[in-house]
From Swiss-Prot:
<comment type="function">
    <text>Transcriptional activator which promotes cell cycle recovery with CLN2, after pheromone induced G1 arrest, probably inhibiting the ability of STE20 to activate the pheromone response pathway. Binds the promoters of genes that function in cell cycle regulation, cytoskeletal organization, and spindle assembly. May also be involved in stress-resistance.</text>
</comment>
<feature type="modified residue" description="Phosphoserine">
    <location>
        <position position="168"/>
    </location>
</feature>
<dbReference type="GO" id="GO:0051301">
    <property type="term" value="P:cell division"/>
</dbReference>
<feature type="region of interest" description="Disordered">
    <location>
        <begin position="234"/>
        <end position="256"/>
    </location>
</feature>
<feature type="compositionally biased region" description="Polar residues">
    <location>
        <begin position="241"/>
        <end position="256"/>
    </location>
</feature>
<keyword id="KW-0346">Stress response</keyword>
<dbReference type="GO" id="GO:0005634">
    <property type="term" value="C:nucleus"/>
</dbReference>
<feature type="compositionally biased region" description="Basic and acidic residues">
    <location>
        <begin position="1"/>
        <end position="26"/>
    </location>
</feature>
<keyword id="KW-0131">Cell cycle</keyword>
<dbReference type="GO" id="GO:0045944">
    <property type="term" value="P:positive regulation of transcription by RNA polymerase II"/>
</dbReference>
<keyword id="KW-0010">Activator</keyword>
<comment type="similarity">
    <text>Belongs to the POG1 family.</text>
</comment>
<feature type="region of interest" description="Disordered">
    <location>
        <begin position="1"/>
        <end position="56"/>
    </location>
</feature>
<dbReference type="GO" id="GO:0000321">
    <property type="term" value="P:re-entry into mitotic cell cycle after pheromone arrest"/>
</dbReference>
<feature type="compositionally biased region" description="Polar residues">
    <location>
        <begin position="27"/>
        <end position="56"/>
    </location>
</feature>
<feature type="modified residue" description="Phosphoserine">
    <location>
        <position position="314"/>
    </location>
</feature>
<dbReference type="GO" id="GO:0030435">
    <property type="term" value="P:sporulation resulting in formation of a cellular spore"/>
</dbReference>
Amino acid sequence: MKQEPHRQSEEKEKPKGPMAVEREQHTSLSSGTTVTASTGDESTNSRPVESSQTEKSLSLRIRILKQLGFDDIQELNACDTGLVEQFLNVRLINDTKELEKIRESNLAKLNQIIDKCMESDKISDSTLNKILDMSMNRDTNNDNNNHLTIPSPITTKKRKINASELASPRGHRRYRSDIPTVSEVETGVGYPQIHQQPGAYTLPMPANQWMSNPYMQPPQPQVQQIMPQYLYPPGMGPQAQLPTMSSNSESQTPVMSSQFLSLNQHGLYQQNIGAHPVMSMGPQANIYGQQHQLQPGQERDQSRKSFSHRRSQSANISMANFRSPMRNPQPASSQRPVNFLIHTPKHPPPT
């Protein structure tokens, strides 16, 4: 019996939980409605302000278009700001053109009036000068008073003659017309025209004229140095007397083709007089036409002589017989192959 009232008390307490939840939900919903109501009020307040601004801008654009002369504004898009700006620029350009036309007509009328005054005898020169001075003074006063002027795209592009350099940040810039020009005749400076002058081409000289020219002949040695013979290989030592160009026969004169004359027409022996002849040229190169020259078959027979060792054959070098006219030896000089091999007891010299 004691447990029943306890159960009844629990049953009475159970419905209190969901009721409390419902109350909490009701309070939260009520608070949410208040918040949404406040945000809605702000949006409704901002929308009329924006709409009023757009309406004002549209009304201004419509008025401007009407003043420009557009009656059918419904066909145009008044909301487009760039379109209205373009119409305004066109109107300004047209106004400036009309002003220039009026100015030109006024100047033409003034010229006609001045011509008539000059032709008439009643008006003297003093009165004309006074009228011109008065007009000049009025122009200067008007320029000083009229500070606010409408800029036109035509007048702004013209260069100001008396413009100050401090007015713009680029004060150091100069115009081409301001730079004084100096002619080449005044300064006395002449520039050579290299590309316009044709180059002169001279044909190569023949062999007879080349050899007869005294300036082309090599200098004759005056002092002969006596050197020991052991420094030179056999047949290569200095000769006792060098023949001159006049003592040589006609066979010793260089018989050369046009190719060699065109390349060496400034003198063959001026560059390297004391140098040795080139060793890469074979014995068949008969440039100077020597009389005592061996045939290729005879030289091959001499080079194929039987030697005692194979190593000595690779070291033997036969010197060429052709030489320059200045270093031409006596015809009775016999040469033999020079051996550059270093002989050792293991490799004795050939016998």
